[in-house]
Structure formats: C-alpha cells, structure tokens
C-alpha cells in the first residue's frame, strides 16, 4: 500500500506565472525577425503609396536583439537548472532525515516484549476499561498484565480474523504453516526500516534475493515491513501516530482534519489487524511512503475490505481496551520521544516550504529585473522617419528609444488599425473600414501536440475557484472532439477542430451573461468560439466576451456570425470544413479578447480570417 504526502503547490504555480510574465514582456518582439518584418512593412507601405509621399527606412537591429534574448534565455536556463537541486536541498533532504530519526526509535520492536496492564477497570470484563501499555517493572506473570499473544487469542472473533489472513498469505506461499504464521504475528519484530541512503546502496549491489522491492528515488522514503500484522500493532496501536489521529480527529503531521470514516479506520489501527498505520492518508505527490510486504508474507488482497468488515465484530472488551488506548494517546503523542519527533517533522516541513518560497521568489525577481533593464535601456533609434503625412498614422520617433518601445512601434506600424495590414506575402488587402480580413495560403495548421500544455480530462479542466475559472496552461478535449488550450492566466488561447459537423448544443444563459468578468463591455455577448450548432460547449470552456457587433447579424458587420453561417451552408451543401485552428489574442491581463485569427479548410482550400473584437 502506498500513501503520499502532498506539498501545497500554489506558490510554485505562482512562480510559473511570474516566469510567464517575463516572456510576455517581450512577446511579439522577436528581434531575430525584426529586420525581415521591417523590410516587409516598407515594401507593403510602398506598394500602397501611389503618390510616393511616404519614405521609411530602417537599420539592422537583429543582432542587438538576438544578443539580449540570448542573455535572457541563458539566465532563465540557469535559474531553472538550479530548481531541482534546491528543492532537494531545502525540502527533500531535511524531510527524509527527520523521517529517519523518527523511525529509528520505533523499528524492530519485539511484540513479545509489549505488555498490556489492567489499569483497574470496573470488573465487567477481563481487561478492564483502562488498560494501557505496561511500563517499568511489569512482568508477564503478573495477574493484571497481558501479552499480545494472550490478547489475540482471547477472543474467537479475533481468531477468525487471524485465520482469514493466514488463508490469504497461504495463497502466496503454499508452504507457510499455521504455526509459523502465528509465531510471526505474535513474536515477530514490528518492522524493518531502511533509509534512502541504504536503499540506494542496496539497489547498486542488486541484492534482489534479500531485498524487498525498493524505489530509491529523490524525495521518496521507503519502509520495508517484513511483518504487516506486527507492523500494524507496533506502528499503529503502540506508536503515537494512529492513536493520536483517532483521538484528536486530525492528522498530527499535516494538521488535516479527519472525516468520521477516517477516524474509524485510524481506530482500527489500534487493534491487531493487518494495515499500515504510519503516515497514511496524507495526500498526493512529491514525497511517497511505500509500505511493501516481503514476497513470503505479503497480503496483497482483501486487507481494507477485511478491516471494514471487522468493525461489526469487535468484542465489547476489546472495544473498551481500544477506547482506553485512545484516552491515553493524547499525552502519549505529546510526551514520548516518537511523538516529539513527529511534531518536529511537521514544523520542519513548514519551515522548508517557506525557505523554498523565499528562494524561488528571489530568483524570479532577479530574472525579471535583468530582462526588464535590458528592454528599457535607451539606445539610438535605428529608424529614420523622413516624411509620414499619410498611411502610417503619424507615428513620432524620438532620437533614442528602448527595445520595448521599439517593438511596440513596429507592431503598431503593421497592424490593421489604420486600414493597412501585413498579411501573407502573396496577399495584401485593404480593409475598407471593416474588421475582418480574409486571405488564402497553402500552409496547413493541423493540431500538433505541444509539451507546453498539460493534458487534462474533460471535467478536470476547471480550477477550484469561485467564480469558476479554467486551469492555466492546459489542453482539454470536449466530448465532441474539439481541442482547447489555455494560457498562463487560464484564458482560452487556441481551439482545434479536425472535422466540423452539424450537431445540436445546449445554452448556458448565466455563463453567456457573465463571461469576461470585469473586462466585459456593455455591448458584449457571451460568444461561442465553436457555435452550438456545431456541438460547441455551452460553458466558459467555449465562451468569451465578444462584441455583439461581430456576434450578431449587423449590416456591414457581424463578421463572426457570417463566418458561422458560411460554415453551416458549406456543410449543408455537402462540402467539408476541416482543420480549423482559432487563435484568441488578449491585451495584458484582460479577460476580453482583442482579435480572433481563424484558419480553416474548405474542400482542401486554406482560408484565414482575422476578426477584431469590436
């Protein structure tokens, strides 16, 4: 049985967003292509300048920009390359060392040496209601002291449970005798603990004939419980952990409150039933505690089921014994050596996570500072504007500028805002005041897998937030086969449809009224990226804030509406609409798109539409 310990990852997710913000700072400013872009812009402007009134020249800037980007990439690489070693140094190693210390005091406990003393009950049963672990000079021969062997065999219900587990083990080892099994259970050692260092050494020596399966990985602590039944008693009933969990109602390592069902299971750990009582139910990922029995003694099936069934079979006297141990456990957890170690471990985990948060935050700030300083450093302007009475919108260039501003000026110079747009080289069209540009090219934009996005199941693509929000940097596929990707802020970034078809879809009026949040404009609709008539999702995983002037059939506008109707007509006429790729662009942190780029094929002919969201 394997249980995990989970570290909260929110801080690390935030740092991922911090890194992405650095990338955003230079997004669209690929200086390696600046020279080519400017040459194209000059050529396109000249082709439209019939009276020759515009003169625009530029000097080479690619090498400077390339050098800066190379420096940025090196800095980011150095930062990322240190993460693994730093995580091991400040989280994995201290945690593993504390685990080693904690187990040092509770391993190899001989069960035959554990005695239970009758604390003076009310005479209603054999053991009394205040039985506790015997200390000091208690002897097995004393009339009020009982051994584990005596307790186990005192009740026929427990004998039946033991018999059941013997039969399970017998399936794994036909030669296992009943007497050997009983001896192992009542006189064996609690468990053998192997440190990570020892496990790695053993792995190197390949002593498979002596070793129990070991996964010696960074951040993984492996326990080898030779005797699962004995381990349940020693680590469950007579260490502080499970007793304290059941008594206090929370996990003493993580502080997480236990449900009623979990407390019942923790209580069952206090009686001699097979189960691993230490550090169970502590979460998922990062640190793993693997409890694995040896090949001879492993009970591979039925343990949990048997434990659950045993609830109704606990005899009254053993139930009272269990309650007594629970009552003793609060002080035991706080005052014993093991209890103190566990408490220290919890504090150490909190401390190391805080250390890592501080270190990662500092490194991210260093990277951002280096890049921003470079982008904002003033340089002599490479562009010389001689005359711009028309076409370029009267953009003014200062004597000096920064690389950041330079990129923004270039971007403004070649966008369709001033009725001039730079599309594919074989097609240059005048927008005539419209917000939709169409062209054709041979390149296909079929879906290609990317390592930059985490694939999640449909239904797992929402973050646990209110209001509802998509997870960041993920890829999900709807039941109709439409593929979506989100950016670092959980905004829909790309949509892919292999083969469009007509299907009926539902509507979510609330989502359509609220999508876009505070960035939504009064004239916005909740627009479907893939329309309902094509089986598009009704929820925010397919909705964006979209201007009603493109989403509805307005005269001279309605570009998005017209595109959907065009697809519908093609499909109704028997034509194929395939290999759709939508790119949704945003400005800054806004949840409202600024432009949509839609590529698709009609009977093999490639089309591109760029639609401004206004």
UniProtKB/Swiss-Prot annotation:
Q: What is its main location?
A: secreted
Q: Is Secreted among this UniProt entry's keywords?
A: yes
Where located?
Answer: Secreted; Cell membrane
Basic and acidic residues bias (residue ranges): 423-435
Gene Ontology cellular component terms for the protein in this record: extracellular region; plasma membrane
What does the record give as the active site?
528
Annotated spans, Disordered: 417-445
Q: Which InterPro entries match?
A: Bact_secretion_toxin, DNA/RNA_non-sp_Endonuclease_sf, Endonuclea_NS_2, PT-TG_dom
Q: Which UniProt keywords apply?
A: Cell membrane, Membrane, Secreted, Virulence
Establish whether keyword Membrane is in the entry.
yes
Say what the protein does: Component of the type VII secretion system (Ess). Plays a role in Ess secretion during infection. Required for the efficient secretion of EsxA. Required for abscess formation and staphylococcal persistence in host tissues. Possesses a toxic DNase activity that is modulated by EssG by forming a nuclease toxin-antitoxin pair. This nuclease toxin targets competitor bacteria.
Q: In which family does this protein belong, per the annotation?
A: Belongs to the EssD family.
Q: How does it assemble?
A: Interacts (via C-terminal) with EssG; this interaction blocks EssD activity. Interacts with EssE.
From the Swiss-Prot or TrEMBL record, give the protein name: Type VII secretion system protein EssD
């Amino acid at each position: 049985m394997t249980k995990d310990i989970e570290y909260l990852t929110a801080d690390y997710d935030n740092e991922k967003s911090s890194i992405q913000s650095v990338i955003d700072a230079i997004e669209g400013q690929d200086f390696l292509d600046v020279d080519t872009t400017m040459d194209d812009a000059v050529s396109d402007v000249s082709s439209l300048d019939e009276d020759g009134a515009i003169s625009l020249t530029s000097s080479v800037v690619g090498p400077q920009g390339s050098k800066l980007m190379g420096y940025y990439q090196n800095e980011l690489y150095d930062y990322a390359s240190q993460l693994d070693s730093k995580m091991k140094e400040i989280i994995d190693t201290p945690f593993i060392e504390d685990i080693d210390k904690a187990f040092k005091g509770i391993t190899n406990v001989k069960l035959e040496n554990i005695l239970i003393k009758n604390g003076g009950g009310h005479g209603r049963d054999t053991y009394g209601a205040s039985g506790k672990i015997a200390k000091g000079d208690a002897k097995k021969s004393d009339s009020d002291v009982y051994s584990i062997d005596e307790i186990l065999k005192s009740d026929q219900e427990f004998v039946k449970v033991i018999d059941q587990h013997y039969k399970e083990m017998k399936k794994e080892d036909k030669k296992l005798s009943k007497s050997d099994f009983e001896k192992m259970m009542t006189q064996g050692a609690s468990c053998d603990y192997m440190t990570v260092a020892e496990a790695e050494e053993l792995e190197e020596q390949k002593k498979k004939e002596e070793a129990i399966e070991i996964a010696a990985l960074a951040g993984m602590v492996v326990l080898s419980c030779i005797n699962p039944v004995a381990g349940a008693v020693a680590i469950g009933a007579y260490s502080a952990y499970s007793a304290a969990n059941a008594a206090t109602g929370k996990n003493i390592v993580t502080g997480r409150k236990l449900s009623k069902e979990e407390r019942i299971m923790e209580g069952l750990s206090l009686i001699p039933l097979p189960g691993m009582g230490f550090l169970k139910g502590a979460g998922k990922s990062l640190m793993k505690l693997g409890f694995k029995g040896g090949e001879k003694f492993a009970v591979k099936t039925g343990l949990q089921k048997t434990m659950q069934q045993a609830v109704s079979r606990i005899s009254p006297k053993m139930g009272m014994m269990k309650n007594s141990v629970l009552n003793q456990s609060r002080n035991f957890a706080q005052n014993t050596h093991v209890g103190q170690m566990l408490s220290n471990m919890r504090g150490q985990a909190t401390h190391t996570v805080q250390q890592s948060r501080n270190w990662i935050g500092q490194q991210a700030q260093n990277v951002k500072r280096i890049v921003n300083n470079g982008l904002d450093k003033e340089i002599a302007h490479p562009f010389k504007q001689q005359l711009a009475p028309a076409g370029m919108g009267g953009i003014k260039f200062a004597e000096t500028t920064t690389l950041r501003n330079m990129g923004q000026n270039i971007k403004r110079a070649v966008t369709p805002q001033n009725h001039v747009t730079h599309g594919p080289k074989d097609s240059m069209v005048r927008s005539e005041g419209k917000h939709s540009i169409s062209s054709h090219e041979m390149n296909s934009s079929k879906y290609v897998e990317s390592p930059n996005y985490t694939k999640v199941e449909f239904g797992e693509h929402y973050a646990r937030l209110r209001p509802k929000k998509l997870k960041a940097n993920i890829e999900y596929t709807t039941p109709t086969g439409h593929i979506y990707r989100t950016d670092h802020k959980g905004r829909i970034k790309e949509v892919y449809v292999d083969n469009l078809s007509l299907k009926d879809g539902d509507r979510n009026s609330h989502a359509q009224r609220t999508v876009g949040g505070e960035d939504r404009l009064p004239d916005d609709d909740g627009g479907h990226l893939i329309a309902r008539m094509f089986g598009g999702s009704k929820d925010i995983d397919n909705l964006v804030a979209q201007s009603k002037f493109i989403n509805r059939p307005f005269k001279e506008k309605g570009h998005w509406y017209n595109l959907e109707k065009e697809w519908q007509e093609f499909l109704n006429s028997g034509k194929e609409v395939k290999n759709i790729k939508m790119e949704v662009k945003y400005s800054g942190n806004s949840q409202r798109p600024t432009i949509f780029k839609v590529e698709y094929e009609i009977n093999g002919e490639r089309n591109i539409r760029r639609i401004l969201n206004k």
